[in-house]
């Protein structure tokens, strides 16, 4: 059985044709950005505001490694993997789509601003 045909512990990834882990692998995304991606695309279907905060936390760690320590060398297959393709086939709303695009373009400030705005909009 193909591992994409089943999910353990919920159905929060079963809503689209292109699975988050496939997109992360296909785009050669760094682990920290992959975590930002998965929490940003599933937050409405699984962990809510806590998932958005987790995404922001992983992004802050990535910024530390990338900006402060200069450890992260981010190369993404931009011509092969298009975030619009993933968003279209998985009905990803605009704010989440903007986060994905910003991560893939190494625009960490935009990703952080968009995540912060999304968190603020959804706080009680």
Regions found by a protein language model. Name each.
Residues 1-124:
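Intrinsically disordered, low-complexity regulatory regions
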């Amino acid at each position: 059985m193909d591992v994409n045909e089943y999910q353990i512990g919920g159905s929060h990834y079963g809503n689209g044709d292109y699975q988050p882990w496939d997109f992360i692998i296909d785009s050669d995304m760094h682990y920290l950005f992959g975590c930002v991606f998965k929490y940003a695309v599933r937050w409405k279907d699984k962990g809510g505001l806590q998932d958005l905060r987790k995404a922001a936390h992983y992004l802050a760690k990535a910024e530390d490694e990338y900006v402060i320590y200069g450890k992260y060398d981010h190369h993404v297959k931009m011509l092969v993997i298009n975030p619009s393709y993933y968003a279209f086939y998985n009905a990803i709303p605009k704010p989440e789509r903007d986060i994905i695009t910003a991560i893939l373009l190494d625009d960490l400030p935009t990703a952080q601003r968009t995540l912060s705005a999304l968190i603020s909009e959804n706080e009680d």
